[in-house]
From Swiss-Prot:
Protein name: Acyl carrier protein
Localization: Cytoplasm
Residue span, Carrier domain: 1-75
GO MF annotation: an example: phosphopantetheine binding
NCBIfam families: acyl_carrier, PRK00982.1-2, PRK00982.1-3, PRK00982.1-4, PRK00982.1-5, PRK12449.1
InterPro entries: ACP, ACP-like_sf, PKS_PP-bd, PP-bd_ACP, Ppantetheine_attach_site
UniProt record similarity statement: Belongs to the acyl carrier protein (ACP) family.
A cellular component annotation (GO) from this entry: membrane
Keywords: Cytoplasm, Fatty acid biosynthesis, Fatty acid metabolism, Lipid biosynthesis, Lipid metabolism, Phosphopantetheine, Phosphoprotein
Top-level division of the source organism's lineage: Bacteria
Function (record text): Carrier of the growing fatty acid chain in fatty acid biosynthesis.
C-alpha cells in the first residue's frame, strides 16, 4: 500500500518513528520538517516511485495524506 511506503520514507528522511505519522500529519506543523526536509522528501518519493513531481504540485503537498492522494492518482 502506498501509505506504508510513504510513511517509511518520511520516517527515514526525518528520523522519526513511523507510528507518529498519520494521513493527517502536516510535514511542518506535526512532523517538524523544514523546507529543505520537504525538498529532500520529494526527491526520495520521486526516486522510490520512479516519477517526477513538478514544483507546482510539490508546493501543494502539505500533509502525508496529500502525498498519498497525489501518488495514488499517478501510480495506480
Amino acid at each position: 500500500m502506498i501509505f506504508e511506503k510513504v510513511r517509511n520514507i518520511i520516517a527515514e528522511q526525518l528520523g522519526i518513528d513511523p507510528e507518529e505519522i498519520t494521513m493527517e500529519s502536516s510535514f511542518i506543523d506535526d512532523l517538524g520538517a523544514d523546507s529543505l526536509d520537504i525538498v529532500e522528501l520529494i526527491m526520495a518519493l520521486e526516486e522510490e516511485f520512479d516519477i517526477e513531481i513538478p514544483d507546482e504540485d510539490a508546493e501543494k503537498i502539505k500533509t502525508v495524506g496529500d502525498v498519498v492522494e497525489y501518488l495514488s492518482n499517478i501510480v495506480e
